[in-house]
């Protein structure tokens, strides 16, 4: 019986987290109360306090349990990084954009991060959250280094500069789409969007065209 009670408590805790995601995305973190979350979950406010001491604790737990986007996506083509690093990176970027476009929960999380949150000192910082769920500098930097080793990118390529530009480009793309999802179809246009970004910043020879590159000065 105790085991069942523990399982039920865990289900309630997860229900509160899912309800918080919905409410934060809808109302904004600042404007959402624990009563709003309790009502959305169909429980009492007291039940919320049994699991979380505050809205901030609930907010932090919501992000701490969220797996990185790279662990959630499934590229349409499985390409080995060592063999075709740039194409493998392309497929990962496309799969990431399509996952955000097609998955309501992930879209809600992106809305919270980019549009619905004013961070305070006791909350996980925006930087920490991005490091947890988003752009992985280490992974992508390793793939770009592999491109250099395979002579896909020139030896003088400035990897750090490419990482900065890629991160800025994809963050801006997602932010703009969230502001007006009807303006363009992120899911359908993901391949073209990725190809254009990569062609500008990392000499993407994906279509046989001339290479552009950012190099060390």
Positions of predicted regions on the chain:
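Short secondary-structure transition hinges
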Residues: 98-141, 152
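Amphipathic alpha-helical packing segments from all-alpha helical-bundle domains
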Residues: 71, 75-76, 83, 87, ...
């Amino acid at each position: 019986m105790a085991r069942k009670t523990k399982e039920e408590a865990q289900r309630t805790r997860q229900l509160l987290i899912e309800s918080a995601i919905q409410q934060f995305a809808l109302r904004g973190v600042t404007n959402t109360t624990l009563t709003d979350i309790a009502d959305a979950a169909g429980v009492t406010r007291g039940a919320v306090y049994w699991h979380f001491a505050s809205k901030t604790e609930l907010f932090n737990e919501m992000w701490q349990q969220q797996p990185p986007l790279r662990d959630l996506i499934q590229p349409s083509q499985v390409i080995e990084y060592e063999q075709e690093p740039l194409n493998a990176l392309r497929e990962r970027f496309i799969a990431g954009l399509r996952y955000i476009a097609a998955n309501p929960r992930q879209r809600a999380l992106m809305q919270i991060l980019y549009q619905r949150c004013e961070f305070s000192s006791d909350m996980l910082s925006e930087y920490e959250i991005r490091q947890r769920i988003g752009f992985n500098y280490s992974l992508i930097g390793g793939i770009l280094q592999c491109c250099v080793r395979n002579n896909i990118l020139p030896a003088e390529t400035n990897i750090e500069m490419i990482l900065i530009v890629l991160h800025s480009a994809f963050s801006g793309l997602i932010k703009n789409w969230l502001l007006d999802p009807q303006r363009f179809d992120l899911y359908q246009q993901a391949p073209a969007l990725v190809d254009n970004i990569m062609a500008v910043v990392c000499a993407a020879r994906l279509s046989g065209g001339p290479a552009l590159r950012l190099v060390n000065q």
